[in-house]
Structure formats: structure tokens, C-alpha cells
Amino acid sequence: MFKKILTAALLLVTLVLTGCGGGGGDKSAETKADNKNSANKLVIYTSMKESLIGGIVEGFKAKNPGIEVDWQSAGAGKIMAKLEAERQSGHLMADIIWTSEVPDFYQMKNEGLLEKYQPAGFDELLNPFNDYDGSFTAARLGTLGIVININKIPTEPTSWETIATDPLYKNSFGIADPALSGTAFMSIALLEKQFGWDYIVRLHDNGATKSKGSGRVVDDTADGALNACLGVDYITAGKIDKGAPLKMVYPKELLMVPSPVALFKDADHKDNAKKFVDYLMTQEAQQKVAEAGTVPVRRDIKMPERYNLPAPEDALANGIKINYSEVLENKDDIVKKFSNLFK
């Protein structure tokens, strides 16, 4: 997982991944230096967008008004690069990590970075991990589908095969870069598992293009620069809520990507981190997950009809099954093959 990264790239990532919450702005270097000495603080690194993480943090702060929350959001690849830079400096700043690149969590577990913690109410949760041991817990069952611009695509695609063959999608279907986006990486791994690498090649041959990130590819579809894309549920839902001419279509082979949350073993604010993970699994927080447009991990959540999301049990049952340990072993190869194909 943690590859050797050029110093310049690490510095860039450190600058890019900035504070988005807590005090409402970037944190100074002095504040960062005091991180370990501040008992009433919590630092979260996440790939979740503000439309999802923002409401959850506000709910947590309402129940824990004495805790200052500094949440920092970026793509999974940038987060892992930042963590590697911090490891090289001798101190991880984050208490919690919450992304969708499942293999990273297996690698961090293998390297002894994660604290085992089973959140309160675990028996009420849907667990997608057969080898669960408390090192990380799914906080949502993210789904991806074919997002179409309804002004460009007159009829819904009937299958994954449609976007690899239909001229309507030629040179106008976008995929986020799996080197940057955890959900994109997992989606490519799932599609390869279900249909073989030949399917990815045929997507390329029909003119599919690589975009920078999971948000950008949905933006480009909403703006009409693309006719369609491989899109994340809640990012698409947020655009639809703002009036974008988009629709999410789910083929029967469902792309379900769990989003694990974990505590770092050397976290400076471990008690606060446990409180946050406990809150994240509550009915209140999981209802916020659903209202943001993605699939919660609790069965007792009322799903918003406007997003056409699968029920949590259905997402777990119908998602393409994959061995995450095997995906970890093949991660570099998958990213390299994709990058060589989609230059």
C-alpha cells in the first residue's frame, strides 16, 4: 500500500489535503504541532465529500460540544500519500480514517497501524467483511452505477454491456482515475472480477475516458461534457438535488463498495475517535448517510425514495462478491493496467 513517493509529491499532497471542519478553515502549523496535547480534539482523514461528512460531523458535535473536529477530505490516493509522509516524519496526525478503498485497510491492518475496535451497536449493523475482527468497520455500503445525462441519453442503459457497445456512449463515457479514487479502483476491480479485463478494454475501445476524480466525472456529466459516467451514489444524488439533469441506473450486477472506518493505534485522541465511530453507527447518523444519497449499514433506516437506492440488505446481497485480500495483492497491477490503457 505505502509506496515510495517522491518528496515533491508528498509536499504537494500535504498542501492539497487541508482542514475542512472543526474551526471552519485551515489549521496553522502551530495548531498542528499542538495536536497531541489537545484532549478535546479529533482529526479525521476521509474521502467522503462535504455533502456526506459535513452533516455527520455536525451531528457528532451537537452531542459532543466539547470536542473540536478537524476533518480533512481528499481522494483515497492522496490521503494514503499524506499518511505515508506523516509516517516518514514519525507521527500520524489523524485519529480516524474513513475512505472507500478497502484494500488499503487490509494493508494498514497487516502493518499494525489500526486499533481493533468494535463499535457500540455492532449487532445492528450489516457487515460485508467475512473476516471481520474489529480492525475496521463498514460505515456505508456505497454503490456505483451508470450515471446518464438525461438530455443526452434518451433511454436508460439495460446492462453494463450497453456502455461498451452503444454508439451513444462512444467517446463520451467517463471513469474516475483509480489511482486517485478508491471507489473508482474498487469499481474497476469488481467489473474485472465479473466480466474479465476484456470488458475494460472494450470500454476503452468505445471511447471511455479517464477523469481526475469521482466528483469531477459526475460534474462533467451534469455539464454535458460527457453523456454518462461511472458515478458514485451520493455524489450523483447531490447534483440531482441541485437540479442537474442526471439519473442513476443500476444494472443487475451491482457495484457495492463498502466504506470502512478505522482508528489508528497511535491516535492522539483515541477516546474521541471511539466516540465518533460509535456515533457514526447510530440510527441518527446512519439516517444522515441515507439522506445524503448513499446506502447505510443499518436495517432500521428509512430510505429516501427520490434517489432510487437499493435497500441495505439488497445492496449487501446483490453486490458483486470479491476477495479483498486478493484485490490488495493485485492492486498495483490493476492500476498500472488501467493507466497504460487510458493514457
Give a label for each model feature.
Residues 145-152, 257-270, 288-289:
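A bilobed periplasmic-binding-protein/Venus flytrap-type ligand-binding module shared by bacterial periplasmic
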Residues 264-321:
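Mature extracytoplasmic/periplasmic domains
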Residues 46-48, 53-54, 76-77, 92-225:
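Extracytoplasmic ligand-binding site segments that recognize negatively charged/polar headgroups
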Residues 103-107, 227-245:
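A ligand-binding cleft/hinge motif common to bilobed small-molecule-binding domains
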Residues 21-24:
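Bacterial signal peptide processing site
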Residues 33-106:
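Early extracytoplasmic/lumenal segment of secretory-pathway proteins
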Residues 16-19:
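C-terminal motif of bacterial Sec signal peptides marking the signal peptidase cleavage site
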Residues 128, 142, 201-203, 210-211, ...:
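Periplasmic-binding protein-like
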